[in-house]
Amino acid sequence: MDSSKVLKLYAELKENAVNNLDIVFYLIDIEKALDELKPRHKFVLTKICIEGYTQSEVAAMLGITKSTINGVYHNALTHFERNFNYDGK
């Protein structure tokens, strides 16, 4: 599963995770993977994938170019993928 889709799914699941233990554990795994990221990477993924900001908006927040944020975003996704190991079980 694409990491950006996982993070968007995280935002949706978090709102709906009332009584489903599997979803709760899935959310915990995602949160752990996010917590293992560098603060800047976590900030960028949270803003773009979970909160819905555009790369341009996040670039403006950080005072960097859109080109730079694109690199940071893809680097953050790569690190997230390494931290988050969902095997579909």
Report the location of each language-model feature.
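Short, glycine/acidic-rich hinge or "gate" loops at secondary-structure transitions
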Residues: 87-89
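Short amphipathic helical patch at the helix-1/turn junction of helix-turn-helix
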Residues: 48-50
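Residue-level signal for the short linker/turn that defines the boundary of a DNA-recognition helix
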Residues: 39, 52-53
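DNA-recognition helix of helix-turn-helix
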Residues: 61-85
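Short alpha-helical "recognition helix" segments of helix-turn-helix
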Residues: 57-59
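A short pre-motif secondary-structure segment
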Residues: 44-45
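Short helix-coil-helix linker/hinge
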Residues: 34-41
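N-terminal interaction/assembly modules
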Residues: 1-27, 31-32
